[in-house]
């Protein structure tokens, strides 16, 4: 395990798939972040082909634009009921979701789901180490967003909720 600067994260994300996601999000003028386990695994120096992307806006639109940029070798699955999409390309799976926030009515365990910000989406994550996000937009490519101290928790071996 090692600490990673934003520049080092940008270097680790210097792959065609991330640059294409960046181009798709920038074209649609939407903020876009790789989140969760993929980011955690970068710090742990573990390889992963399972990428989760949060879009402040429509994850489905960014996934569709990515498919257009990647061409016929990419396969897209859209799950409108859940507001998600998955793009498979050269052995890599990228899951897209729009940032959302959840609230609950008294006496109900069923969440009320609304569009949200990156912070809203990070707040609903299970653990701080899975709330880590790295920006993919060109102007902030590689910038870590860690509002809950997830990197410190990772180093300290602590599992806690945001």
Residues of each region from the PLM?
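Catalytic cores of the polymerase beta-like nucleotidyltransferase superfamily
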Residues: 1-162
């Amino acid at each position: 395990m090692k600490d990673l600067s934003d520049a080092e994260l940008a270097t680790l994300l210097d792959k065609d798939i991330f640059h294409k996601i960046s181009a798709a999000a920038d074209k649609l003028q939407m903020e876009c972040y790789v989140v969760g386990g993929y980011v955690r695994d970068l710090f742990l120096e573990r390889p992963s082909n399972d990428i989760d992307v949060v879009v402040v806006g429509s994850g489905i639109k960014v996934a569709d634009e990515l498919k257009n940029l990647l061409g016929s070798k990419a396969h897209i699955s859209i799950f409108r009921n859940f507001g998600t999409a998955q793009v498979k390309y050269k052995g890599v799976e990228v899951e897209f979701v729009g940032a959302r926030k959840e609230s609950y009515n008294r006496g109900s365990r069923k969440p009320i789901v609304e569009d949200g910000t990156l912070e809203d989406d990070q707040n609903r994550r299970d653990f701080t180490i899975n709330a880590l996000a790295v920006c993919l937009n060109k102007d902030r490519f590689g910038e870590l967003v860690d509002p809950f101290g997830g990197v410190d928790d990772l180093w300290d071996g602590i599992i806690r909720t945001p």
